Amino acid sequence: MMSELLQQQTWRVIDHTSLGPSFDAKQSFAFDDALCESVGSGQSQPVVRLWVHHQTVVLGIQDTKLPYIEKGLAYLHEQGWRTIVRNSGGLAVVLDEGVLNVSLIFPDTKKGIDIDRGYEAMATLIAHMLPEAHVQTGEVVGSYCPGSFDLSINGKKFAGISQRRIRGGVAVQVYICVNGSGAERAGWIREFYERSLAGEQTKFTYPTIVPHTMASLSELLSKEMTVSALVIRLYEALQAFGSRLEPSSLTPAEWERYYMYFQRMIDRNETMLPT
């Protein structure tokens, strides 16, 4: 399956994979909003941004409505996890040094990029990055943040996709569990939900996490995979679609927008999470 969204003449490449433990996940969502605005207004070529965060659980808006969320958060914090609420769709996911995040940022054209086209472009890219595997698309029941565009190998989920649209730009974001234990990551989220629900029935159905439904690429391919090696595969896949890659950083105008969006993320988190 080819996706015309991947056949861009030029991609700006912004690599945030090695900024270390002080790199706050709230910053990533602010970066993507700032870049969406640039791409959406025609001031920038499409962007591919790569990012890694240490020991962070990223919650969805729906997670903030859990009846005993303060108990779930306390558990995660005791285990050394930071927590934030993102501004795109979905539910709780785990980020750590073994998880590569990729954002593809496109202009939302006059015809409009429908939601499925954005998801399909990312799924196609990941499949091209992993030619030795049969990557399947479809909800993996029992995984965390389940959705119809879960990516799996042999029925075990290793990646999930979300989208964010703002000011004429579309950010399609994926997390990829590259190495480490997928089941262990899922175990943290299962415990978070169990403590945050404490047996109470809710209108919204939160996922029942079955840890063995999730795995990393290292586990699934039976070979050690690294974030840096997967980044190289991503570059090669984009070039195979005929694109030129242009290493880049934010412009002064983008930094200005970034600081505005970062403050919004800080304010949002202060409002939505119990202190």
UniProtKB/Swiss-Prot annotation:
Assigned keywords, A-Z: Acyltransferase, Transferase
Catalytic activity line of the entry: N(6)-octanoyl-L-lysyl-[glycine-cleavage complex H protein] + L-lysyl-[lipoyl-carrier protein] = N(6)-octanoyl-L-lysyl-[lipoyl-carrier protein] + L-lysyl-[glycine-cleavage complex H protein]
Recorded GO MF terms: lipoyl(octanoyl) transferase activity
A Pfam family reported for this protein in Swiss-Prot or TrEMBL: LplA-B_cat
Span of domain BPL/LPL catalytic: 42-246
Feature type site, description Lowers pKa of active site Cys: K157
Entry annotation: catalytic residues: C145 (acyl-thioester intermediate)
Record-listed E.C. numbers: 2.3.1.204
Record pathway: Protein modification; protein lipoylation via endogenous pathway; protein N(6)-(lipoyl)lysine from octanoyl-[acyl-carrier-protein]
Example GO BP: protein modification process
CDD domains tied to this protein: LplA
Signal peptide (residue range): none
Recorded family membership: Belongs to the octanoyltransferase LipL family.
Function, in words: Catalyzes the amidotransfer (transamidation) of the octanoyl moiety from octanoyl-GcvH to the lipoyl domain of the E2 subunit of lipoate-dependent enzymes.
HAMAP family, alphabetized: LipL
Further comment found in the protein's record: The reaction proceeds via a thioester-linked acyl-enzyme intermediate.
Name of the protein in its database record: Octanoyl-[GcvH]:protein N-octanoyltransferase
The species this protein was found in: Anoxybacillus flavithermus (strain DSM 21510 / WK1)
